[in-house]
A protein has these predicted regions:
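N-terminal targeting peptides, primarily Sec-dependent signal peptides
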Residues: 2-3
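Short acidic, Gly/Pro-enriched loop/turn segments at secondary-structure junctions
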Residues: 104-116
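Short acidic/polar capping segments at secondary-structure boundaries
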Residues: 105-106, 139-141
Length: 142
């Protein structure tokens, strides 16, 4: 049985952000703390206004600090209202779309590998294992 450490680690990194957001949802954001959350704008379950999606190439970074409302944290996603140039936008962000998050006040940040990089890593490991197979037939006595 293959133990997929990358998958386990990625799941637990997302759980750190999930727990932080639950704390903020229940108790608010303490003075000084602020989060930078970067996510893949092309994730299939991401729900953001088109004008915001069109403004960015691949990834979007949001800041949760002063002007945010209605933070709701679910098992697989969170939703939040944020102000962009005096326009309120509702975002629903799946945890699977998260690339990184940081709290500069706490000097804390995490980088979360994308799924396709994990698949590439597995493929490379698979090639390595195939190359280590030794055919013993030539060493056998008849």
């Amino acid at each position: 049985m293959f133990i997929d450490y990358s998958k386990i680690l990625k799941k637990n990194l997302k759980n750190v952000l999930h727990e932080v957001l639950v704390i903020i949802e229940n108790k608010g954001l303490k003075e000084g703390h602020h989060l930078y959350i970067t996510f893949d704008k092309n994730h299939k379950k991401l729900k953001i206004p088109n004008w915001l999606k069109n403004k960015h190439k691949n990834n979007i970074t949001i800041v949760i600090q002063y002007e945010f409302w209605n933070l709701k944290v679910q098992k697989n996603e969170f939703s939040i209202d944020l102000s962009f140039n005096n326009t309120i936008a509702n975002l629903t962000v799946p945890f699977d779309s998260i690339i990184s998050f940081a709290d500069p006040y706490a000097n804390f940040g995490l980088q979360i590998a994308k799924d396709n990089s994990l698949k590439k890593e597995k493929k490379e490991k698979s090639k390595i294992h195939k190359n280590k197979i030794i055919n013993l037939d030539k060493y056998r006595k008849n």
